[in-house]
């Protein structure tokens, strides 16, 4: 048993539709929804250099240093949220939420190795992994405020780097999930969001 058995976990790579799908589920079933992306700012303020050395280095980088000047392998290795920094704060937040109803948590910060100890039933967690084409299309349709690569001196190179970095991250998620007995669901755009949301609802045992 886990003290977080009332939580349903949706992790995965960027551009897979995690936010869209979990909002559909939250609206459909009246669930509390926790976005790990939305808490990055607040959690960053609580993390120091000792707790989060990768984050400390990331803070000091310019936009070009983050997204243009380094190769994707280095970008993956140096991105704090891909390596569990601040994950303990997510767990702290979840434990402060009501336990008498289901909570849906979503975001790329949910790493299989870190989530697994908090999951009694593997069906309560899933990782959404976009295909390369779906990821690229998702990034290119992001609103201007979210297109951080546009704030570099070479947006085209920055986007290429980010897409390759995220491919590496997605591959690691698939590998780690399989090793931990957890499921990764590939998203290729061939199904509607409603169809995928229905599959997730069945998986999570959600009922109106």
Predicted segments with their positions:
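Short beta-strand-centered segment that lines the nucleotide-binding/catalytic pocket of NTP-utilizing
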Residues: 29-47
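Hydrophobic positions on the alpha1 helix immediately C-terminal to the Walker A/P-loop
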Residues: 21
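A glycine- and Lys/Arg-enriched "phosphate-lid" helix/loop adjacent to the NTP-binding pocket
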Residues: 122-169
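Hydrophobic anchor at the beta1->P-loop junction of P-loop NTPases
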Residues: 10
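Conserved lysine of the Walker
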Residues: 18
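NTP-dependent small-molecule kinase module
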Residues: 168-208
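P-loop (Walker A) phosphate-binding loop of NTP-binding proteins
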Residues: 13
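ATP-dependent small-molecule kinase phosphotransfer cores
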Residues: 42-102, 109
């Amino acid at each position: 048993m886990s003290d977080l058995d009332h939580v349903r976990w949706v992790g995965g790579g960027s551009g897979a539709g995690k936010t869209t799908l979990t909002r559909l589920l939250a609206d459909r079933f009246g669930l509390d929804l926790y976005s790990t992306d939305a808490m990055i700012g607040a959690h960053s303020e609580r993390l120091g250099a000792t707790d989060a050395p990768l984050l400390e280095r990331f803070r000091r980088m310019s936009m070009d240093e983050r997204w243009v000047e380094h190769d994707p392998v280095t970008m993956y290795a140096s991105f704090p949220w891909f390596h569990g920094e601040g994950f303990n704060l997510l767990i702290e937040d979840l434990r402060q939420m009501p336990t008498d109803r289901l909570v849906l948590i979503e975001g790329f910060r949910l790493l299989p190795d870190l989530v697994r100890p908090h999951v009694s039933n593997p069906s309560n967690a899933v990782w959404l992994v976009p295909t390369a084409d779906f990821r690229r299309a998702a990034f290119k349709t992001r609103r201007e405020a979210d297109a951080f690569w546009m704030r570099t001196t070479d947006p085209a190179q920055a986007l290429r780097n980010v897409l390759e970095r995220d491919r590496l991250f997605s591959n690691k998620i698939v590998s780690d999930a399989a090793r931990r007995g957890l499921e990764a669901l590939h998203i290729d755009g061939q199904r509607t969001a409603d169809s995928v949301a229905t599959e997730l609802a069945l998986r999570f045992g959600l009922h109106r």
